Amino acid sequence: IMDNAAVRRGKPSVYAKWGPSVAILSGDAMMICAYRLLSEVPAELLPRILGTFNTMALEVCEGQQYDMDFESKRKVSVVEYMHMIELKTSVLLAGSVTIGAMLGGASEEDCRKLRRFAIELGLAFQLQDDLLDSYGDDRLGKAIGGDILEGKQTYLMITAMSRADEATREALRTTRLDARLSDAEKIAAVKAVYDRLE
């Protein structure tokens, strides 16, 4: 809903198919289903698992807020970006893995190691997603250039901004807003800068 995405992982989004009201209610219903499942956790594990779940949910919200804030921020560092994607993407995977490990009887040390692995895997996933947005194949279900047109601060954009001279940085900031250019021309112009600054 927040990014008006018509497609998610190659399928029509709930938002695009049924509108924002159904999408919001669907999200609420999924959260309630999650808590229903959590209520079935053995009593001795419930505090740890519920704490892990709630922390994960709050961190995902925090990461999403950073992502939206970054769209209007003039300069975002790679460190800030990596923190944002850890919160927005990695902690969901890490929380899920950690809860599974707890339910499976894993030691604290093993839970910690699995969490760290999942964090790194989530970072790799998001960085790959950034690359696919600009250089992927739209037959795989991700429209090419969506992040560019939305003004998203991706790893590619942040790196290009850090390597570019001021005139090129200004062009990167404003190309997506140029009404004289088609979306395809805007995407091509930004990708040309990415390629040049590689």
Question: Model-predicted segments: where are they?
Answer:
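All-alpha prenyltransferase/terpene-synthase fold signal
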Residues: 1-198
